[in-house]
């Protein structure tokens, strides 16, 4: 009997998180009160994965993933929406400096709803809206399981397209406005790539600070419409590259002050135009290179204008242990979006139509709004 009891207790302890013995009196049979638990599993998930690096339209595919255990410190999130960013494409191509090992699930930011939580999780409940903050790879799937520390709870009243896209691009715009030059109300900035999400955010965030923006766009079909859209966001001046074929581009500024700060995400001639606008001692910050052309700077720009060239990479900034600061800024940006003070173009695309969204994100169909997958 003793051996049998030891065997029962041993098995119970093996499969139970806690075991409580009742106090017994002489002649009573000891009983064991067991608090049982069952393993929490996520539902099966559908995901966009790539098993090798290459062109995204060739190496990505939709797969079914099995359920994943939700451990004691984990949160299982049912994804609501996730964007396709240029950095996502670069990761798949294998040219981004930081990328997950393959095979990998695509995506780096997004918004989801808490589906289940581990036994030690106290900060989240099913139904909460959350985003990975700082961003975390693997958001192009229907269910994501990651540790509690990865997730940041947000206001559910913010439109999902902004919640899904608030980190990578709007946060880049905010940091660049604050980290390089001490700007005051009445100052101005100049940027190329003004129709990008970062560009649109720069216009609106600068305007909230009383800072004017000079915006450069490419000559292409729809440029007049793009100019009007940027003006509606608060852009002070919008020029196409062909309008800048003048001897002194600063003559186009009118009453605007010469900018002390410029942003470049294109490279090539578009970067040179930004440099021409900068005042003596000005700074150009490069955060992208969409044209894949190098930046050429004249010797006179350095000697006679003392210009400074800097770079910004959000991933590097986030790696400096700034989780708290990151989340505070995200809440600020989400508040602006919720109140209609921060807007940008997005297109919601059902998960089943991912190939179409990818083609648009790759530029195969001309200029398109930010593609946001909905699950």
From Swiss-Prot:
It comes from Arabidopsis thaliana (Mouse-ear cress). GO terms for cellular component: chloroplast; cytosol; mitochondrion; nucleus. Homodimer. Its EC number is 1.3.1.104. It comes from the Eukaryota. One of its GO terms (molecular function) is copper ion binding. Residues 1-37 form a transit peptide. Catalyzes the NADPH-dependent reduction of trans-2-enoyl thioesters in mitochondrial fatty acid synthesis (fatty acid synthesis type II). Fatty acid chain elongation in mitochondria uses acyl carrier protein (ACP) as an acyl group carrier, but the enzyme accepts both ACP and CoA thioesters as substrates in vitro. The active site is at 96 (proton donor). NADP(+) binds at residues 169, 195-198, 218-220, 287-290, 312-314, 370. InterPro entries: ADH-like_C, ADH-like_N, GroES-like_sf, Mito_Enoyl-ACP_Reductase, NAD(P)-bd_dom_sf, PKS_ER. It is an enzyme of class 1 (oxidoreductase). It is found in: Mitochondrion. Gene3D superfamilies: Medium-chain alcohol dehydrogenases, catalytic domain, NAD(P)-binding Rossmann-like Domain. It catalyses: a 2,3-saturated acyl-[ACP] + NADP(+) = a (2E)-enoyl-[ACP] + NADPH + H(+). This is Enoyl-[acyl-carrier-protein] reductase, mitochondrial. GO terms for biological process: fatty acid biosynthetic process. Belongs to the zinc-containing alcohol dehydrogenase family. Quinone oxidoreductase subfamily. Keywords: Fatty acid biosynthesis, Fatty acid metabolism, Lipid biosynthesis, Lipid metabolism, Mitochondrion, NADP, Oxidoreductase, Transit peptide.
